[in-house]
Every structure is written in C-alpha cells, then in structure tokens.
C-alpha cells in the first residue's frame, strides 16, 4: 500500500534536493537515483531546462511523495518502485531525482522532477486528473509488487499524517507536534521551515 502526494516547488529547488538526498535518511545515499541529471547538480540542470521553457510559470519543480505502510516493503524494493513510478509518470521526458528515506518507521520515496520537459520544454500540468494518474500508476506498481492497495474512497480526503497514523497506530497530533519541533530545530529560516514541513507531506 502506498499513499501519494505532490506539490509544486516555486523556490529553493537546491534545498529541496539537498533535503531528500540527506545521507542520514538514505543510507549514505545508497538509495538515491536520478535521470537526465546528477543529484549534485540537479538544481542547475533544472534551471537550464527552465531557461528554455516557453511557458511563464512560477513552478520550478514538483515534489512527489510515495509513502508505504510500515513493514510491508523492503528498502530496496521501495526504491525500485519509486524509480518505476518516476519512469512511468515522466516517460523519459523530465529530469528527476528519486530517493528513499529509511530513517523512520515508515519507508517513503521522494521524487523531485523538473517542471519543464527536456524535449519540447513544455511545463508539466499539475491538476486533479494528473494526480489521479499518479495514484493509478502507484496502485498498479503496488499490485505488481504484491503489495496491498488503498481501497478507492476509503482514504479520500485524508491528509498524509492522518493516513500514516492509521497505519502505525500513533496519535496524529503528537506526531504533528514532533514534526513541527524537528523542522523548527533543523531550519535556519522560515522559508526553510516551510520547505521541510512540505517535504514531510504537510500542506502549508
């Protein structure tokens, strides 16, 4: 079972990529992969593509989170699924970085991809239909890997932390408080605090 969520990145693409590539979260970057870019230079690679884009949009990249139910998938398999999801969704047109965070009780993937494609330099259109497409692809991959799938409608409208608390039995308010405290301690600016909270799946 995997929960998916996506949001746009309008600034600090480099900080977002640095966060998802954190060695402490990715087993010293063992679970970091990329396509049509290097994780170390992805922000610059994205900018080069965006500079040639025809559309004027504030969205520089998109951050997709794919979180699995605790204990259902190994680190290695989760990372494979993340790469497969990125490949199926982006069809070889967009540069991306995919990482798997293994430092908590729930394994989850982070996929950050450039908002403009490398071929025609058109922008990715984020809408309700595109999100449903992401969820459909994720569910199909879960089935292929013999993982459970979220029952349609059963999780509708739930935020990421609410879904997660249902999976591991933790109190969602306590978890939110912990996440806020962690991000406050880790961030040096308010913008960075917002970035860290969004990376954890919160809508702000």
Describe the residue ranges of each PLM region:
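N-terminal nicking endonuclease/strand-transfer module with a His-rich metal-binding environment
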Residues: 1-204
């Amino acid at each position: 079972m995997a929960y998916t969520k996506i949001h746009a990145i309008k600034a600090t693409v480099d900080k977002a990529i640095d966060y998802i590539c954190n060695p402490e979260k990715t087993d010293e970057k063992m679970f970091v992969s990329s396509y049509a870019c290097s994780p170390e230079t992805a922000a610059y690679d994205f900018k080069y593509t965006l500079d040639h884009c025809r559309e004027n949009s504030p969205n520089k990249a998109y951050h997709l989170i794919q979180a699995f139910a605790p204990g259902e998938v190994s680190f290695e398999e989760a990372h494979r699924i993340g790469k497969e999801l990125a490949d199926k969704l982006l069809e070889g047109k967009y540069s991306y970085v995919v990482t798997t965070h293994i430092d908590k009780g729930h394994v989850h993937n982070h996929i950050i991809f450039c908002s403009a494609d490398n071929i025609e330099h058109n922008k990715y259109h984020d809408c309700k239909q595109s999100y449903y497409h992401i969820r459909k692809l994720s569910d199909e991959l879960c089935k292929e890997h013999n993982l459970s799938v979220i029952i349609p409608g059963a999780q509708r409208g739930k935020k990421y932390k609410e879904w997660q608390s249902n999976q591991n039995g933790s109190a969602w308010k306590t978890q939110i408080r912990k996440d806020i405290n962690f991000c406050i301690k880790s961030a040096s600016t308010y913008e960075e605090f917002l970035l860290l909270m969004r990376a954890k799946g919160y809508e702000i």
